[in-house]
A protein has these predicted regions:
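SAM-dependent transferase fold signal centered on methyltransferase-like domains
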Residues: 1-375
Length: 375
């Protein structure tokens, strides 16, 4: 890329800025949008739009949630990735985007992708919403950056303001899906919007990517939550999570060699349904603020699973005796008074290997070092 940019003067007939942008976009698409990267005629947008667009994996997940219907509208079109997958579920699909350049790109790409039923509208999504005919489904991905380009995390600070538009959205469609930042408090989102029937927290390779909120007109069904991590999905009713009780380890003696250690995946961490995990999987939480769980038996837990080989206090002699055979380890701290870097220096261990060390707290002040291997 850099060499090509430096040689731009040798090819005056080539729009070098455009060419470099297409190469960079394709390189990103190879991992983010593999089916698009295989299509030679796709046009890629500027870097920010590529950075902000959904991945193919998360777009496919959204499409899987949508019932087949007659008509849908995406009010915040962007690069059009989500639209391109969801639109295949409908006979008629409208993409709305205020930036003319993105509309031109979308119009071309939709033809290339065989979405001949897609209608591209260049205009403001809110203005279009107020005058559009009712449809079966509306999708929005509100902007989460302010005028200065800084990220915003409050629902009311997103553009457009979904809270203000809720009623008109539900007048125009029976079902509305909104993509939000996973940084938002999902409890507050539900309270702010009302009419929420589903909350999906979607992770890819245990990295939280997005929160999806589904609103349905006149729905009396209980709120359901979906913790998604790649092909693994945990579903529960929000009311069941509220009614569940966290089971805590009452004494350090319950944490011993041979015990199984579990760490929930990123989506479950975000949803925070820890009591439900205790009841559903028969595990106990090590501490009130330590989001690690143990059990005597191995269970099919949604997250990382380890088996403990050594349990140690922070006593120097005990540490020396228990960790003398370890030269390198992956170190994680969970509710612990020092950082993983400081602990690594204190234990004089190199990074990596097959050994995992979890530093955590049982009870109020019982600091523990758990040495474990992945199962």
């Amino acid at each position: 890329m850099r060499e090509l940019a430096l040689q731009g003067g040798r090819y005056p007939e080539v729009d070098m800025a455009f060419a470099l942008n297409q190469i960079a976009g394709w390189q990103t698409a190879r991992t983010k949008l593999p089916s698009w990267a295989e299509c030679a005629d796709i046009i890629y947008p500027p870097h920010l739009s590529m950075e902000q667009c959904s991945s193919e994996q998360t777009a496919l997940y959204k499409a899987s949630l949508v019932e087949k219907g007659v008509s849908m509208t995406d009010l915040t079109g962007g690069f059009g990735v989500d639209f391109s997958f969801i639109a295949r579920r409908f006979s008629s699909a409208t993409y709305v985007e205020r930036l003319a350049d993105l509309c031109d790109i979308a119009r071309r790409n939709f033809e290339v992708l065989g979405l001949h039923h897609a209608d591209v509208v260049c205009g403001d999504g809110v203005d279009f919403l107020r005058t559009m005919k009712p449809v079966d489904f509306i999708y929005l991905d509100p902007a989460r950056r302010d005028l200065n380009g800084s990220r915003t995390y409050a629902l009311e600070d997103c553009t457009p303001n979904i809270i203000e538009l809720r009623d008109v959205l539900l007048e125009k469609a029976r079902t509305v899906m909104i993509k939000l930042s996973p940084m938002l408090d999902w409890h507050k989102v539900v309270d702010d919007l009302g009419c929420v029937s589903e909350v999906h927290v979607v992770s890819v390779r245990n990295e939280c990517k997005e929160m999806l909120v589904v609103l349905r007109r006149d729905s009396n069904a209980p709120l359901r939550c979906y913790a998604v991590n790649d092909d693994e999905t945990v579903v529960f009713r929000a009311s069941d999570a509220v009614a569940s009780t966290v089971r805590l380890v009452s004494d350090t003696s319950e944490i011993r060699r041979g015990s199984y250690l579990f760490e929930p995946n990123a989506s479950l961490m975000k949803l925070g349904c820890f009591g439900l995990l205790c009841e559903r999987y028969g595990v106990k939480k090590i501490g009130a603020h330590s989001n690690l769980f143990i059990a005597d038996e191995s269970v099919d837990f949604p997250g990382r699973k380890f088996q403990i080989s050594t349990v140690s206090s922070m006593n120097k002699k005990e540490l020396r005796r228990n960790l003398s055979f370890i030269t390198r380890a992956n170190i994680a701290v969970r509710n612990f008074p020092i950082s993983s870097q400081d602990l690594r220096r204190q234990l004089k261990l190199k990074d990596g290997g097959d050994t995992y060390i979890f530093a955590t707290t049982q009870g109020e002040r019982n600091h523990l070092i758990l040495v474990a291997g992945k199962v």
